[in-house]
Amino acid sequence: MSANCVSAAPTSPKNSDVEEIRKSATYHSSVWGNHFLSYTSDVTEITAAEKEQLEKLKEKVKNLLAQTPDESTGKMELIDAIQRLGVGYHFTTEIQESLRQIHEGQIRNDDDDVRVVALRFRLLRQGGYRAPCDVFEKFMDDGGNFKESLKKDVEGMLSLYEASYYGIDGEEIMDKALEFSSSHLESMLHNISTKTNKSLLRRLQEALDTPISKAAIRLGATKFISTYREDESHNEDILNFAKLDFNILQKMHQEEANYLTRWWEDLDLASKLDFARDRMVESYFWSLGVYFQPQYRTSRIYLTKIISIVAVIDDIYDVYGSFDDLRSFTDVIQSWKISNADELPPYMRICFEALLGIYEDMGDRIGAPYAIDTMKELVDTYMQEAEWCYTEYVPTVDEYMKVALVTGGYLMVATTFLTGINNITKKDFDWIRNRPRLLQVAEVLTRLMDDIAGHGTEKKTTAVSCYMKEYECSEMEASRELSKQVKKAWKDLNDEWMEPRSSSAEIIGCIVNMSRVLHIMYSTGDDGFSDSSTRTTQAVKTLLVDHPMN
């Protein structure tokens, strides 16, 4: 929303200058156009030979997992490789049982090796176990700092660095681990020869850019496959299994992108509503980041369609609609009746009809009513932000966040995705509808990431502008303080992930994974959804366009 506001209390809407500002936003056209129409059935067909080979390799990897003792460092390294290669979903039961054994045993024979201790800690916390952080105390000196001698161990530093991102609020030792390891790795980065240590240089850059805890699994796998291939101790069966699985899934995802492109072209919203963002492919990338596995196809389809339409609705409220039209649009969506749409301008009616069509496709799924309710709530808060804009009102940070956490769309997105999963129950939807702590934390995290990245690039009210106004500070000071809240939110997500969990791992994973994909879009300081011509485009290209792994 427009940030050209003053700190007066809300009054009646004004016309004139504010409306002109609201109509000034411009967005680049779709980077992809109809590119994915080229992925026809003959291109995306998965052959019988591929399926047979995948099953053979899967059995070999499964046997390897069974034969490697849980009491060994090799078992932890095996689990880590399988998960980072993106194929852990094939062995969920086996990995969970191994981690249970490791947790119960809390093996101590390698306690003097920081690499192994950090790896064990990370794997257990990734698996939901509250592994104690005091295992790192033996690596501290009398002054309470990590021993300088650890800096000689590059692999140990990398392992400690990755583990440090699984800390929770109040774990001072994990904060020290992050500061110690990251500063040393950054120093190493500037001193490594690009000629003699290309592999290590790339690993350091990738780790510092996106630690494992914040990485979307599928994107992380594309990078780790190359790293694993270069490891002299790699297992050829695991490597071949990961590459084949990636290629098969890529075909599935290309077919989905083809279907969605045809759906989007049939709607023709991009030409009918040319003031709005055309971001269908970026919306699919978002849904792919939540869950990429084959069984979540329906959820990805629902979510991609909804995000694509919501981007247009958001632009109607932010950019194009007059105040009176926005009020009418809000009322019609609250009624959820197509018969009431006759009073709307044509461009709003087109959008409303498209929105209704998606929810009609959900039929009698348990989550459909919940998904509709969250959409109504989202639009209602869009209207609240529009009123702020038209009355030139700058809310306090608390006022802003109460509304902005909803306009961020996190609950709507999560509910929509879960609607496509058959085994999600009414109890599950009631739980998430009540906004549990996990969801609140994720909403704060992504809202602030978006606002910090977007402040100054668009004429919008953000948490940064509200903080600057309320606390009379500079943009840098406001961003610094809000960034502290982002760091705490990541820790709180870790806390919610670990046992005892408030819901199933599948639902919690959905919410956490959404934060990871949004981290990709916003972590460079840019809005990677609205301006998708940079990092997001490369991510889409990596997952959906680049040639298969070989």
UniProtKB/Swiss-Prot annotation:
Cofactor(s) needed for function: Mg(2+); Mn(2+)
EC class of the enzyme, as a word: lyase
GO biological process: diterpenoid biosynthetic process
Keyword Repeat: no
Chain ranges for the short sequence motif DDXXD motif as given in the UniProt record: 314-318
Record-level Gene Ontology MF annotations: magnesium ion binding; terpene synthase activity
Record Pfam families: Terpene_synth, Terpene_synth_C
Catalysed conversion reaction: (2E,6E)-farnesyl diphosphate = (+)-beta-selinene + diphosphate; (2E,6E)-farnesyl diphosphate = alpha-selinene + diphosphate
Residues binding Mg(2+) 1: 314, 318
Binding site for Mg(2+) 2: 314, 318
Cofactor note: Binds 3 Mg(2+) or Mn(2+) ions per subunit.
Keyword Lyase recorded: yes
Family statement drawn from the similarity comment of this UniProt entry: Belongs to the terpene synthase family.
Protein's name according to its UniProt entry: Selinene synthase
Lineage: Eukaryota, Viridiplantae, Streptophyta, Embryophyta, Tracheophyta
